[in-house]
Amino acid sequence: METMKATVFHSANNIRVEEVPRPSAGVGEAVIKITLTTICGTDLHILRGEYAVKPGLVIGHEPVGVIEELGEGLTGYKIGDRVLVGAITPCGQCRACLSAQWAQCGHGEGVEAIGGWRFGNTINGAQAEYLLVPNAQANLAKIPMN
C-alpha cells in the first residue's frame, strides 16, 4: 500500500503530520497531487475543537493541484491538468444541486441542511500530498498553464 504525508486531526489542539494511505480513484473520482493549499479560519476552528470533526480525519479544503489519476466516467480532464478543487463539494444529484444551490448539497442523502462542505469535515481533506475528489466532474476547474 502506498502512503503519503497528511495533516491529521486527533482532538482539539492536537493535529499531526502523519503517514496515511494514498487514495486511489474510483468511478467518477479523481486523485489530485496537491501543489498549493491554504489554512483558513475554518481550519483554525477545527484545531480549537469548535467544529465537530471525527478524529483521524485529514483536514483542509482549499487546494490547487495536478490531476494524478482519473476514475472512469470523467470527461474534459486528463492526467497532468492543473486544477482548482472546490471547497464546496456538491454531488450534482440531490434536490439542492438540481436547484443550483450547491452549497446546500445533501450529498445524495436527503439531508440538505448539512451543506456542501465535505473536505476536512466529513471526508479526508487537502492538507495532504494527495486528495481524493468525489464527483470530480462537478468539483474541479481547470487552471490554464500560462
Which residues does each predicted region cover?
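Short glycine/threonine/proline-enriched tight-turn/helix- or strand-capping micro-motif at secondary-structure
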Residues: N14-P21
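Residue-level recognition of beta-strand termini and adjacent short loop/turns
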Residues: S11-N13, G26
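Glycine-rich beta-strand-centered segment in the early N-terminal region that forms part
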Residues: P21-T37, L47-L98, A103, I123-N124, ...
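Active-site phosphate-binding/coordination module
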Residues: D43
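NAD(P)H dinucleotide-binding glycine-rich loop of Rossmann-like/cofactor-binding domains
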Residues: Q93-N146
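Short structural boundary motif marking the start of a folded domain
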Residues: E2-T7
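Conserved hydrophobic "DFG−1" position in protein kinase catalytic cores
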Residues: V8, R22, I46, L132-V133, ...
